[in-house]
């Protein structure tokens, strides 16, 4: 589900990950992970674009973004329900694609699970399926008390 906006944000993401790593922050990559039968699944029937098939180029993290000691979550759907191991006083920032699918889903799940935790999204490090859907997802997250910002917070 790549887009020109997704490609354009990669330098911002790379800089953000370096900033996290330099501070010693916990870095978790999530990978939308599907099988060869994706188009036969309920999700695949509603979003009939074969993507993120485990082991393929579209599934792997963009070259140059991975760092030592990062963690991976291979999630079979938009949102991951097993966000465990965070303290209420942690700050959790999300970046990535697609703003209007995976990012918004996980931001809202995290806010529901950790209501006293600051959950934020850097809009400059996200991209949606379209620019319009990206903006709509950012507004939805703001409505759900997710701190949405651009660049430095």
What is the predicted role of each segment?
Residues 24, 88-92, 116:
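A general structural motif
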């Amino acid at each position: 589900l790549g887009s020109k906006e997704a490609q354009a944000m990669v330098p911002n993401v790379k800089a953000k990950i370096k900033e996290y790593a330099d501070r010693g922050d916990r870095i978790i990559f999530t990978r939308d992970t599907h099988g060869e039968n994706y188009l036969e699944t309920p999700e695949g029937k509603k979003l009939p674009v074969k993507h993120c098939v485990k082991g393929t180029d579209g599934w792997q993290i963009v070259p140059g973004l991975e760092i030592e000691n990062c963690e991976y979550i291979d999630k079979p759907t938009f949102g991951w329900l097993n966000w465990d191991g965070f303290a209420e006083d942690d700050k959790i920032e999300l970046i990535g694609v697609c703003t209007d699918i995976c990012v918004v889903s996980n931001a809202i799940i995290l806010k529901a699970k950790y209501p006293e935790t600051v959950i934020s999204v850097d809009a400059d490090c996200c991209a949606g399926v379209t620019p319009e859907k990206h903006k709509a997802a950012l507004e939805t997250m703001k409505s759900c008390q997710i701190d949405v910002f651009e660049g430095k917070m």
